[in-house]
């Protein structure tokens, strides 16, 4: 199975196009988030790119964003834009497994700076993306998650510790995907 997309599908639109469409009321953050979630629902059983995918939480954020756009008061340039964020970037209240079954799952006390900036800008945090144990394996192999798969060839992995984010980006799980890189974590999936 290979992923084939039309660039006119809502889940595949770039962030700047979404913001322009929200501003003109041609699209709403809710309908875009619903389209992204439907696309993720179709592909996630094959790709294993996400951790903590919570559709209702994402839709709640999208509804709040929609109200801000209707009032002409978006929080920032990313308001309503669906985004994934790598699981090693703490989000308040969520466990941070670091890709390994060896850590105790305890909720993060606060957002890490990248997550905080995304929330301040109104971004819709759709899901966390998977990573290998401690972000240390270029293969993407994890003792906590199933191996993330390349949407263009499901027999392969994107590789790198941002393998989940790389798979999510290539599959069109929305326009923005936040990862981290020290030794190739973003560059390998790219």
What are these regions (language model features)?
Residues 1-59:
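An N-terminal boundary/leader segment
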Residues 39, 43, 61, 65, ...:
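Short alpha-helical functional segments enriched in proximate histidine and acidic residues
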Residues 36, 58, 80, 86, ...:
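Conserved hydrophobic/aromatic pocket- or pore-lining residues that grip, position, or stack substrates
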Residues 77-114:
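Enzymes and membrane/adaptor proteins characterized by extended Gly/Ser/Thr/Asp/Glu-rich
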